[in-house]
Amino acid sequence: MIGRLRGILAYKQPPWLVIDVGGVGYELEAPMSTFYDLPDVGRDVILFTHYAQKEDSVALYGFLREGERRLFRDVQKVTGIGAKIALAVLSGVSVDEFARLITSGDITALTRIPGIGKKTAERMVVELRDRAADFSSGAPITGQLGPDAVSEATVALQQLGYKPAEAARMARDAGAEGDEVATVIRKALQAALR
């Protein structure tokens, strides 16, 4: 089991990143919440990981905060939810916001997260309500991202399941001159939840 990786960030392009640990490059899939706060390529990084092995595949997921990894694991315990939707949850809302939505039973807001319909949202509320208070996001880590924020945000939104035209519109509407990628993505996802 691989629980944590510490190394040099060698590559990042949502949803994938590569960490060089002693000359071995570990490829991980990560939610946008992690990408928001990653350091620049070539810098040291520590990620909490989740190792998943299925009959025909092996996957490694990375998170900057233990609370994100815990939420990722807990969301997958809900009937009918897998890693793809768990990543969409972490990409769409913060851990604290998700806990608030579950505690308050806000089905409408949950259905705005890509891949979550009304029945899935209802199941999530029922199955996670008792554990919602245990979700903790931890302290944020500051990160810097590239200059062409709208273009990079468009690609990231497509990776989250939005159609190319919709992703481009969302990024364009959310972006302002000089914005970082994380800011554009965050604004676009928040606008989609309204």
From Swiss-Prot:
UniProt entry tagged with the keyword DNA-binding: yes
Localization per record: Cytoplasm
Region (Domain III): 145-194
Single GO term (MF): four-way junction helicase activity
Transmembrane segments: none
Residue segments, region Flexible linker: 140-144
GO-annotated biological processes: DNA recombination; DNA repair
UniProt keywords, alphabetically: Cytoplasm, DNA damage, DNA recombination, DNA repair, DNA-binding
Renumbered residue ranges of the record's region Domain II: 65-140
Residue ranges, annotated region (Domain I): 1-64
Highest rank taxon of the organism: Bacteria
GO cellular component, one term: Holliday junction resolvase complex
Subunit structure as annotated in this protein's UniProt entry: Homotetramer. Forms an RuvA(8)-RuvB(12)-Holliday junction (HJ) complex. HJ DNA is sandwiched between 2 RuvA tetramers; dsDNA enters through RuvA and exits via RuvB. An RuvB hexamer assembles on each DNA strand where it exits the tetramer. Each RuvB hexamer is contacted by two RuvA subunits (via domain III) on 2 adjacent RuvB subunits; this complex drives branch migration. In the full resolvosome a probable DNA-RuvA(4)-RuvB(12)-RuvC(2) complex forms which resolves the HJ.
Protein family membership: Belongs to the RuvA family.
UniProt domain comment: Has three domains with a flexible linker between the domains II and III and assumes an 'L' shape. Domain III is highly mobile and contacts RuvB.
Described purpose of this protein according to its UniProt entry: The RuvA-RuvB-RuvC complex processes Holliday junction (HJ) DNA during genetic recombination and DNA repair, while the RuvA-RuvB complex plays an important role in the rescue of blocked DNA replication forks via replication fork reversal (RFR). RuvA specifically binds to HJ cruciform DNA, conferring on it an open structure. The RuvB hexamer acts as an ATP-dependent pump, pulling dsDNA into and through the RuvAB complex. HJ branch migration allows RuvC to scan DNA until it finds its consensus sequence, where it cleaves and resolves the cruciform DNA.
UniProt-listed HAMAP family: DNA_HJ_migration_RuvA
Protein name: Holliday junction branch migration complex subunit RuvA
Organism: Xanthomonas euvesicatoria pv. vesicatoria (strain 85-10) (Xanthomonas campestris pv. vesicatoria)
Lineage of the species this protein comes from: Bacteria, Pseudomonadati, Pseudomonadota, Gammaproteobacteria, Lysobacterales
